[in-house]
Amino acid sequence: MKVGTVGLLAALGMTLTSVSVWSLTPEASQDPQGPVVGSDLVVADPGPAQPVIRADFTAGSTVMVEGRLGNGVMQAGRDNETYLMARVFADGSARASEAAPVNLAIVIDRSGSMKGKRMENAINAAKGTIAALNRGDVVSVIAYDAEAETLVQATTIDEISRQRVTEALSNIRAIGDTCISCAMDAAERALANRDGMVNRVMLLTDGEPTRGMKDVSGFERMSSRLRDKGISVSTIGVDVDYNERILSAIARESNGRHYFVENADSLTKIFEEERNALKQTVAKDTELVVDLAPGIRVEKVFDRAFRQEGNKLIVPMGTVSGGEEKTLLVRLSVPRGAEGERAVAKIDLAYQDLVERRRGSCNGELAALISSDPAKLTPMDPFVAARVGRSETAQSLLDANALFAQGRVEEAQKRLTAQLEELNRRRAEAQKTPNFEPKADKDFDKQEAALGAANSGFAQPPPPPGAAPAKPAPETRKGKAQTRSNAEAAADLAF
């Protein structure tokens, strides 16, 4: 800390409270490669080894963490509510000399509904992924109907084994029912005991589970178990008759992605996207810890699995690929207090660095200014406002899906319209802030597009004169497709 800063604080007669002491505790896990940068609202820093606290910060190297408070200045003399946002990202500049080894399970639905072109396209997409794997990667192939069959046990890729795995894919035939939970159990076993690798399941289905586990909560528990073992599951729903709630839940709880493929011809693109992300993975076992200052309370954690231990929120974030970002949003209650700087939270990010081949970490701290001067109060940070909008938009899409499934089409559209109005209000407020940037505007644009597509997709034109009565909206192909598109959009917005 600068001598001038010490003198100024002494001249003002300020003393350190217990909260201030908390905020200045040294952080042993600070990554020496990762400088901390941010805007003003700086509290005294007694030494160069300690993080500076402020209303926003960015820290890290291979993987970065950006922390932001929704409101940098809050009203004195009353309880306040604000948001904390953490963005975990790799900008693509850090690259390993060679890709991290992959431990992949390809899981394909072979129930009767997959016959024909769907199965052909699924097999071809999987073959493309096998062809792109590096020597030393490990792959398993599982096909499932009423039960799961491991067609290829965990196999290390070389030129001979690559051909054998490809031939095994050609032998998949569509028959029987659908047991997704059986397939996930088999994938979990196939991926076991492979330390130092990036573990991924690519699960494809076109239908409802008709055998085994059938409830969303059961799949959430199963997916959490896989996540805790370092396994993420990316789910691919084909056509319009699969259960989007189950596939979304699997992906969300395991830190994977969810895809909707209306036309099976697009499967190759999805498989390519997944394998490119795997090849560009720079970190695994990534975990955020948000250590709240005394008195700060959690009101809600949005969109992500977490556990709370005292004042600490522990949030697993899975793998991070170059160019990828993942976010955490938390609504906080800040109790009334005296004017001055108020510590809010420390944020620590820890991960297995696949570029430097070591454990990596970085951190920073967030603090707000408590003021009785109304002129100093700040509107919500535009990036936080956009992220709040994403959670609200994702929820509105899911709410609209539920209403639509009940045949309450007008109510579904009203829910979407109401969220669009709220989104426009948030955007207008954000645009007035001095640090508004095009990136935040693009975030709002993406949400607006998702809401517009949903409203349009749910619209049901009246049948022409003399035509037979139309099917109920939820039973039409258009309605089913829009419901699944909404679920995919919601999963992406919440990521």
PLM features per residue range, with description:
Residues 321-339:
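Low-complexity, intrinsically disordered segments enriched in Ser/Thr together with acidic residues
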Residues 301-325:
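Extracellular adhesion/glycan-binding regions together with long Ser/Thr-
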Residues 2-3, 22-29, 50-52, 66-72, ...:
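Exposed acidic/Ser/Thr-rich ligand/metal-binding surfaces
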Residues 26-41:
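Ser/Thr/Pro/Gly-rich low-complexity linker/stalk segments immediately outside membranes or between
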Residues 19-30, 334-495:
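Long, acidic serine/threonine- and proline-rich intrinsically disordered regions
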Residues 149-153, 293-301, 354-358:
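Short aromatic-acidic-glycine turn motif
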Residues 8-20:
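Hydrophobic membrane-insertion alpha-helices, especially the h-region
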